[in-house]
Amino acid sequence: MTGFATIQTDHKIFLRACAALRPEDWDGQEAPLKAVDAEGWEHISKLAVQFGLLGLVARNLGWANERTGVAIPVLARMTVWRQGQLMQMLAHRKAARRIGEALTAAGIRFVVFKGMALVDAVYGDLSLRAFRDCDIFVDRVRLEPAYAILQDLGYSLALHESLQDYLVRDKAGANMSHSDGSSVDLHWAIQGYEMGPSDPEIIWRHCRPPEPSQGLPGWRMSPELTLINVAAHYQVHEYEEFKSLVDFYLTAVKLGGRIDIDELFKTLQVLNMRQTVDIAARLCQRFFIPNPLVERLAAGPPSLHARLACRILTEKSLLRLDKIRPTERRLRGLICSGAVASSARAFRKMLLPKARELELRFGRSFDLGMYPKYYIVQAYRLFGRTRKPFSDLA
């Protein structure tokens, strides 16, 4: 774990608690565990809650306590919280099953991926990883029927008024929420920084029909595409959601034996996602317990871009409790992820948007008054640290 020695002690314990797979992974950790003071344990607890890793960290700290005998002041409280989280996840899973059964009954082919699928295939325990949405991917030609079914189940669009509003803005998915607190992300494309809206056939070629042992209806991504997708998700969120890096690491560990490395590299080439996975693997190599697949993916000297990304994405920048400004986050994502050409295009789009781009931003026909309003809104988002989307402020 290159550079691990320079990481502060409470962060070291948090990172091990994210990566431990068995009680024995805490052997030899008595000294760093004892070095964490009360404030440090509170910090670890807050990180676990903020990144949706409360259950995983609580279980693994329980192992640490059992294996080393070191007292962990926040463990009892985190264990109670983990039980409460389990009840929430059971409710979300019930809602997801209702959605899956309705789509299946209508003969609509769909893929369940991200949080819900990772809990089944990687974590194996609903209490370990929190998720908010049920993410499903459908064929574009079946999008409207799938949307209608979700409406019939009581789900409504969370941001725009109609599905067409998402389509004209070149979105890849739409979030829909229910009065019972559940929500679903309906996707018709999968994309990343360097990957435009995906050719559906490429995605479907790497998905598998449901198996009888699955807890939920719906197709699943192959192990190779699952690993790629969690890396893409980490990148798309400009490296702010640390849970996605943990997803990547644990997917590599748990599904590594089923991943065809040649097929993985071939798919990375087709989707233009090699750099994305390379950076995720190098961060895992730095922070987590060594793993053969991670080492293979991070082998060789890093590219100039990967070297720059890893210098920017330090443990302190990734494990921060305060939210960074949206524009600051976007700039970090562009510097760390985009190729030179795409980064230049993105910076131009941010600083000098074209008429069509402003139309998509404002949702109406272009007029010159959009330019001053665009810069005022962006300045407010930058200096006001607001988390609201542009459309809510325009």
Task: Name the predicted role of every residue range.
Residues 2-132, 138-394:
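Conserved NTP-donor binding/palm subdomain of two-metal-ion nucleotidyltransferases/polymerases, i.e.
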